[in-house]
From Swiss-Prot:
Organism the protein comes from: Anaeromyxobacter dehalogenans (strain 2CP-C)
Name of this protein: Bifunctional protein FolD
Subunit (UniProt): Homodimer.
Keywords, sorted A to Z: Amino-acid biosynthesis, Histidine biosynthesis, Hydrolase, Methionine biosynthesis, Multifunctional enzyme, NADP, One-carbon metabolism, Oxidoreductase, Purine biosynthesis
Highest rank taxon of the organism: Bacteria
Membership in a protein family: Belongs to the tetrahydrofolate dehydrogenase/cyclohydrolase family.
Residue numbers binding NADP(+): G164, R165, S166, S189
Length: 282
């Protein structure tokens, strides 16, 4: 069984990004990512600190706009409009969740597609769905594809199962696998025979957000297992959406939790940001 080490691959990606950032700086372009955070959600604060640290490591200028929880939707949209117009800002990321009085979809849609560091704008998602290259892609599925490449797993002709249908991971993940000529199935909470679907999959991507929902005994012998899930149990232990030990005994390759997909999601945010900066520099 091959353990697909997300930390190791993310470090490689960061090295590549740092080289790109230096090349842009030599041409007078200082790559910049702006993060907008509303309120004082503790988890959001931790995530933003991590993103700032990642940016520092590769030479990207990171700016945070931390707004009070009372910020109105109009005020937030006005800030995004200013950032869209600022040539020093190459990527914009709005940290979720937003307060309940703010329309999350309206805010994300207000980000210019040309500055959409998360790859969530409908224009960019639509471009992905019809195979247009050169647009930012959602970070987690993009990170999964890079992990498959690094593990020398070619999706072409293989049965791929994506467990989860979110707009952030599941749906774009399925599109990226389809783009690479996999035969793709999407399963979800209402799938009638999840065990049967898992048992047929050569590549399994679990992204449903339920601790150890996918039993290791279901996994096809020799399958590649990518576990996007990150769930904290009552005892504080972090586990994925797949029973790791039992699945690892059957899989040819598997990602750990933690230390698997998580570091790659953050690394691909840096990739998106530098790619957006390169478009401006052309």
């Amino acid at each position: 069984m091959n353990l697909i080490d997300g930390k190791q691959i993310a470090a490689k990606v960061k090295g590549e990004v740092a080289t790109e950032v230096r090349a842009l700086a030599a041409r007078g372009v200082q790559t910049g990512l702006t993060v907008v955070r509303v309120g004082d959600d503790p988890a959001s604060a931790i995530y933003v600190r991590g993103k700032r640290k990642d940016c520092e490591e590769v030479g990207i200028t990171s700016v945070e706009h931390h707004l009070p929880v009372t910020t109105t939707q109009a005020e937030l949209l006005a800030l995004i409009a200013r950032l869209n117009a600022d040539p020093a800002v190459h990527g914009i990321l709005v940290q979720l969740p937003l307060p309940k009085h703010v329309d999350e979809r309206a805010v994300l849609d207000a980000i210019s597609p040309a500055k959409d560091a998360d790859g969530f704008h409908p224009f960019n998602v639509g471009a992905l769905s019809i195979g247009i290259a050169g647009v930012p892609r959602p970070c987690t599925p993009a990170g999964v594809m890079r992990m498959l490449d690094e593990a020398r797993v070619d999706p072409k002709g293989k049965r791929a199962l994506v467990v989860g249908r979110s707009n952030i991971v599941g749906k774009p993940m399925a599109m990226m696998l389809l783009e690479r000529h996999a035969t793709v199935t999407i399963a979800h909470s209402r799938t009638a025979d999840l065990a049967g679907e898992v048992g047929r999959a050569d590549i399994l991507v679990a992204a449903i957000g339920k601790a150890e929902l996918v039993k290791g005994a279901w996994v096809k012998e020799g399958a590649v297992v990518i576990d996007v899930g990150m769930n904290r149990l009552a005892d504080g232990k972090l586990v994925g959406d797949v029973e790791f030990a039992a699945a690892a005994a059957r899989a040819s390759a598997i990602t750990p939790v933690p230390g698997g997909v998580g570091p790659m999601t953050r690394a691909m945010l840096l990739v998106n940001t530098v790619e957006l900066a390169k478009r401006v520099a052309r």
